[in-house]
């Protein structure tokens, strides 16, 4: 965005822009401090829950709100009304062009997570206080620098929705108690199993020219002049990984439930043709992270190789990153 220097919630804005949840303006700006209307928030939540900005199925849906007919956001408002996500300013007025507050946004996102507005106390005179408390409990307000009772700026709306993507979904058990929604998934997980010695032939600038599994082979190659420019042998330890199938049960996030979004955390080893370690080779449009598990390195997520990558992340090589990906292989962002 042309005004990216003014954006504080950078990661949230970048991710939601990539997902189409929140968009910039035709002049290339984002206008992070402009406020969000209730209609705009209804659309954002619709896209968050459906992965699409097409709401034609709701164009002719009925509504109790008399002030949304002919409004550009009417289908999104009708959807959110049907899902119990929104409430009106009165029994018949939604006020689509009025700015949305942080408290109202918190309530909408809590219902998106799975809370029942009535059961959770998000209605009545204390709805704002209860919404703020539950939003805090569920991490929706993390890194949000805004007064919740006032009109919500675009960048902080993005931050709240971004937090909701990572929030655990909830449901109600037979006793009416709130429980986290769980899902079971299978994955191939790399575990660090041992360490082996490698012997590199390097030149006078310490650039690696060749690698051998034994000192004897490396010494012979050096003495025989097999590798041009090699001046010495440097030994190093290289980790060996064993890949095993792992089944685990985890809480299902909003991003997983509605957008098939997942995250994997690890050390960025490869971006395109650039690689941090010669043992991690790559071609074009490849991203690889080392997320192997050891006693001192238990990571979130298990996927380590991605091929649908549109952005160059070479500048992050060697850093610990979180990869956000959609479906099974499409990288949305690396943070």
List the predicted regions and their residue ranges:
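Feature responds to low-complexity, polar/acidic, surface-exposed segments characteristic
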Residues: 1-10, 23-42, 46-74, 83-103, ...
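Mature N-terminal segment immediately following signal peptide/propeptide cleavage
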Residues: 13-22
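Extended alpha-solenoid helical-repeat scaffolds
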Residues: 265, 271-273, 283-284, 291-296
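Beta-strand/loop nucleic-acid-binding surfaces
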Residues: 286-311
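Short nucleic-acid-contacting surface segments enriched for D/E, G, S/T with interspersed K/R
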Residues: 305-323
